[in-house]
């Protein structure tokens, strides 16, 4: 699959209410949280898009070469599903690789694994890792054909990403390698969460 067929999407449209300040701009080991997602995605695509909360847009734009847009105004505040919708609607590609902005340990190998499974079942429309029995929908692959089903869910005010998997042919990936990469799926919601890993 050609890199031009892919766009990386960092989902940074949330309010970070529980953390108390914007999580994307928190630093861990001298880099911002979102930069871990950026690094992981840039191994798989030359194009990375940040879906930003309005209060962070200007800060993200200081990172030259990264396109930054805000959630579609119709769906601002409607969660990650709105961010995925905005990315697919605004930028043309076949596949959208999503990553949260608050996973400072995210590794590129996660996407290597997801693409290896997609290569075996290329007709799937979403590819989602499952770790310890839990789906991880914010670290996944979404085909451009997900646009209409996502918009339908948003219009119905059904904002959980999991609802999408009832509408599109989804491949759920359970792989033993995820056990060694389990920290990739750790999202930091509160300052004390980070202290557990430092």
Swiss-Prot record:
InterPro entries: MobA-like_NTP_Trfase, Molybde_CF_guanTrfase, Nucleotide-diphossugar_trans. One of its GO terms (cellular component) is cytoplasm. Its cofactor is Mg(2+). The keyword Metal-binding applies. It is an enzyme of class 2 (transferase). One of its GO terms (biological process) is Mo-molybdopterin cofactor biosynthetic process. GTP binds at residues 11-13, 23, 71, 102. The keyword Transferase applies. GO terms for molecular function: GTP binding; metal ion binding; molybdenum cofactor guanylyltransferase activity. It is found in: Cytoplasm. Keywords: Cytoplasm, GTP-binding, Magnesium, Metal-binding, Molybdenum cofactor biosynthesis, Nucleotide-binding, Transferase. Its EC number is 2.7.7.77. It catalyses: Mo-molybdopterin + GTP + H(+) = Mo-molybdopterin guanine dinucleotide + diphosphate. Belongs to the MobA family. HAMAP family: MobA (MF_00316). Transfers a GMP moiety from GTP to Mo-molybdopterin (Mo-MPT) cofactor (Moco or molybdenum cofactor) to form Mo-molybdopterin guanine dinucleotide (Mo-MGD) cofactor. This is Probable molybdenum cofactor guanylyltransferase. It comes from Halalkalibacterium halodurans (strain ATCC BAA-125 / DSM 18197 / FERM 7344 / JCM 9153 / C-125). The lineage of its organism: Bacteria, Bacillati, Bacillota, Bacilli, Bacillales. The gene is mobA.
């Amino acid at each position: 699959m050609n890199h031009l067929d892919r766009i990386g999407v960092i989902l940074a449209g949330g309010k970070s209410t529980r953390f108390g300040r914007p999580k994307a701009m928190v630093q861990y080991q001298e880099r911002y949280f979102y930069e871990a997602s950026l690094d992981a995605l840039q191994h798989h695509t030359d194009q990375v898009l940040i879906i930003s909360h309005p209060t962070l847009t200007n800060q993200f734009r200081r990172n030259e070469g990264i396109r930054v847009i805000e959630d579609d105004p119709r769906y601002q505040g409607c969660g990650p599903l709105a961010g995925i919708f905005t990315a697919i609607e605004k930028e043309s590609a076949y596949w959208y690789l999503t990553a949260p902005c608050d996973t400072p340990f995210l590794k590129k190998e996660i996407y290597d694994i997801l693409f290896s499974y997609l290569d075996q079942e290329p007709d799937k429309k979403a590819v989602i890792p499952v770790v310890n029995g839990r789906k991880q929908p914010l670290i996944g692959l979404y085909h451009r054909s997900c646009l209409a089903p996502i918009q339908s869910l948003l219009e119905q005010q059904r904002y959980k990403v999991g609802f999408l998997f009832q509408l599109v042919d989804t491949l759920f990936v359970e792989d033993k390698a995820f056990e060694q990469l389990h920290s990739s799926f750790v999202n930091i919601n509160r300052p004390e969460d980070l202290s557990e890993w430092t």
